[in-house]
């Protein structure tokens, strides 16, 4: 099975410009290819991982990746399928975000070894050197307005209004391909399926300006079995930066993937072989309640993104919280595992009597209910049942002198911080 066949088998090929020519190029020698990442935030997220890992698979097959950080295009904003114009960021912000994205990409691509080691480029380096007049004369003249307006990515915005700034975005992305081809002999661009219009602008410019053929391959935009956009949890993006999304949160995200998605995601997001995935699928289908596919997915992706130690910590937090063994975890681990739990900052004037604190922290709606909860054995302090109505919290109840965990029943938590 050649690399293109494997990508197809993993569900990673959505559309190509000329499949036969692309397969021929990939099987006959080393291909230099690139994927672009606009710095629209200070971190990449799970949605970016599809293209990043596809790029890594091609590198492992002997091809040479170029990771393009859009320091210039990030200043403009891609209008593709957006309902409204993006808020323009300052140059300083985009520069800072560009640097952070560079650092993240180095975790996935090999920038150090072999003749096909990855290269990092920033399109600000060339766009900052081109005058507006030269850009219009040398690049703009190759694009007709009819061609630019025909792109599905901007048709919707034409109806509601689009600035010239965003309208010109596809020409800038097209020039990226031309520049990388001229300087590095890059002949293939990889990106999300929503980028098709911008990406083919590059092959158009290559054909008209240099009389060369470029290839485009898009990866699918991933949705779950219900059709919901992938990569978000409770409406929040799952970031690759551990400071924005903890390894535990990422672990839980994968652990809660639906059965109908789990095996498909193993093919897309892990480097397990297709034979290994087939064996997992067989075991998974025989006992879905054991969630083997989800557990494997969580292990593989968290280890890939954050490392083995972070995976082991996420697994330990999961197991200890499930067992109610709060005292087996550090304050730092509890902050990860209980990040979505209501947090109450204890004030100097607060009563530390347990009945009062249950009401103050929002665990029980009233003192009467708090007393009943205690008497019925429904209250747990740092994982241990508490029934003493006269109990007062002390420094001994603070884990690492930072926090106390109170639970009512099985699921209602509050974290007290000091």
From Swiss-Prot:
It catalyses: tRNA(Tyr) + L-tyrosine + ATP = L-tyrosyl-tRNA(Tyr) + AMP + diphosphate + H(+). Its EC number is 6.1.1.1. A motif ('KMSKS' region) lies at residues 229-233. The keyword Cytoplasm applies. ATP binds at residue 232. NCBIfam families: tyrS. Belongs to the class-I aminoacyl-tRNA synthetase family. TyrS type 1 subfamily. This is Tyrosine--tRNA ligase. It comes from Streptococcus equi subsp. equi (strain 4047).
């Amino acid at each position: 099975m050649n690399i293109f066949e494997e990508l197809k088998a993993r569900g990673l090929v959505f559309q190509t410009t000329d499949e036969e020519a692309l397969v021929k190029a990939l099987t006959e020698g080393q291909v230099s290819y690139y994927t672009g990442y606009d710095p629209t935030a200070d971190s990449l997220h799970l949605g970016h991982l599809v293209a990043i890992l596809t790029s890594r698979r091609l590198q492992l097959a002997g091809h040479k990746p170029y990771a393009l950080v859009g320091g210039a295009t990030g200043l403009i904003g891609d209008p593709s399928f957006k309902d409204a114009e993006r808020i323009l960021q300052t140059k300083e912000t985009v520069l800072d975000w560009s640097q952070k994205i560079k650092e993240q990409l180095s975790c996935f691509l090999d920038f150090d070894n072999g003749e096909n080691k990855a290269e990092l480029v920033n399109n600000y380096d060339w766009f900052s050197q081109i005058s507006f007049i030269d850009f219009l004369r040398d690049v703009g003249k190759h694009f007709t307005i009819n061609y630019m307006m025909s792109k599905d990515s901007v048709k919707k915005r034409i109806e509601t209004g689009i600035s010239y700034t965003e309208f010109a975005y596809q020409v800038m992305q097209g020039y990226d391909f031309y520049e990388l081809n001229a300087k590095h002999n890059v002949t293939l661009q990889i990106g999300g399926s929503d980028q098709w219009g911008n990406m083919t602008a590059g092959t158009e410019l290559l054909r008209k300006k240099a009389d060369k053929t470029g290839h485009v391959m898009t990866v699918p935009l991933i949705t779950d079995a219900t059709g919901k956009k992938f990569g978000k949890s409770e409406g929040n993006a799952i970031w690759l930066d551990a400071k924005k999304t903890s390894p535990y949160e990422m672990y839980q995200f994968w652990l809660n993937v639906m059965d109908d998605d789990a095996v498909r995601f193993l093919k897309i997001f892990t480097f397990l072989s297709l034979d290994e995935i087939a064996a997992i699928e067989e075991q998974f289908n025989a006992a879905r309640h054991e969630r083997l596919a989800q557990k494997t997915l969580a292990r593989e992706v968290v280890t890939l993104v954050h490392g083995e130690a972070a995976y082991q910590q996420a697994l330990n937090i999961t197991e200890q919280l499930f067992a109610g063994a709060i005292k087996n975890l550090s304050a730092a681990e509890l902050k990860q595992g209980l990040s979505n739990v209501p947090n109450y900052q204890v004030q100097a004037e607060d009563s530390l009597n347990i009945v009062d604190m249950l009401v103050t922290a929002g665990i029980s709606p009233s003192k009467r209910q708090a007393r009943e909860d205690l008497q019925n054995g429904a209250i747990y302090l740092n994982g241990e049942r508490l029934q003493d109505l006269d109990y007062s919290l002390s420094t001994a109840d603070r884990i690492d002198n930072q926090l106390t965990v109170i639970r009512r029943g099985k699921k209602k938590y509050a974290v007290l911080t000091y």
